[in-house]
Design a protein with these regions (language model features):
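Cysteine-rich micro-motifs
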Residues: 43, 51-67, 135-145
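Acidic, proline/glycine-rich low-complexity IDRs
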Residues: 122-154
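A short, highly charged nucleic-acid-interacting micro-segment common to nuclease
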Residues: 12
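Short recognition patches in nucleic-acid-associated and regulatory proteins
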Residues: 1-6, 17-52, 67-87, 93-130
Length: 154
């Protein structure tokens, strides 16, 4: 099943089809994670909470004591960037994701990716990196507020 190379080592509960794949993110078997962002979490009306980009940039990374592990960076991930064979950009400042509802810093993260047809994707050196859409869901482990963002990557 297709998954981006950066996500593959942390993917759990993988499910999907040739064109759409969903996975939870786990670190050492744990799904309660500290997340670093270039972006923001916004509370919305009627539970429509959002994960928003900071300008044109959204970066999501796992926080670890020995360094953050990028899961998604809108500047270099996805179909258009794989097509252009873009190199990783300079590091960007990240900040801890904090739930705006309860101020908790632990989240469960689910990612979904949409891919073009198999024939088109097979032309890439790393087909899993050639996704056209990503859906990110971050659920606070304390108050269970869910923050969602979807981004085009083509």
């Amino acid at each position: 099943m297709l998954l981006p190379a950066a996500v593959r080592p942390y993917a759990a509960d993988v499910d999907g089809t040739d064109s759409r794949v969903r996975c939870a993110i786990a670190l050492n078997g744990l799904k309660d994670l500290r997340i670093q962002l270039c972006g923001r979490l916004k509370r919305g009306l009627f539970g429509r909470n959002q994960l928003l980009a900071d300008g044109d940039v959204l970066c999501v990374a796992l926080h670890q004591p020995d360094g953050d592990v990028p899961l998604f960076d809108s500047r270099c991930d996805g179909y258009a960037n794989a097509l252009d064979d873009r190199q990783p950009p300079a590091p960007i400042p990240l900040h801890p994701a904090i739930c705006p509802k309860c101020r908790n810093a632990a989240f469960q993260v689910d990612l979904s990716f949409e891919y073009p047809d198999a024939e088109e994707v097979s032309a890439f050196a790393n087909p899993g990196d050639a996704f056209t859409w990503i859906w990110i869901s971050m659920r606070c482990t304390r108050c269970h507020a869910v923050f969602r963002g979807d981004f085009t990557a083509d």
